[in-house]
Amino acid sequence: MKFCVAVSLLIIASMAGVISVSGYDVYPRDYAENYYYCGVRKDPDCSKICKLHGARVGYCHVKRCSCVDLPEKNQNFLSVIWKHC
């Protein structure tokens, strides 16, 4: 019974974006360490932002751009720029 509750909480937390499971639902950050927000007035194209960070694809999740298979080292914008210099 306790195991089922623990697994259920883990699934809910991963779906809500509280924790990251195997690189899924990772939020990229801009040069000022802020998240890319979406779902308000001017929506950034999350897929383009995530591809700039080296992820496969991106989407809007809980008003923040979320990337699929985003490498941890590319989560910050400046680390991506530094790699290309």
From Swiss-Prot:
The record's subcellular locations are: Secreted
Where does the UniProt annotation place the signal sequence? 1-23
SUPFAM superfamilies (alphabetical):
Scorpion toxin-like
What does the entry state regarding organ or tissue expression? Expressed by the venom gland.
* GO cellular component, as recorded: extracellular region
Residue intervals of the LCN-type CS-alpha/beta domain: 24-85
Listed as disulfide-bonded, the cysteine pairs are: C38-C60, C46-C65, C50-C67
Q: Which UniProt keywords apply?
A: Disulfide bond, Neurotoxin, Secreted, Signal, Toxin
A GO molecular function assigned to this protein is: sodium channel inhibitor activity
The family annotation for this protein states: Belongs to the long (3 C-C) scorpion toxin superfamily.
Q: What is known of its domains?
A: Has the structural arrangement of an alpha-helix connected to antiparallel beta-sheets by disulfide bonds (CS-alpha/beta).
**Descriptive protein name:** Neurtoxin 10
Source organism of the structure: Lychas mucronatus
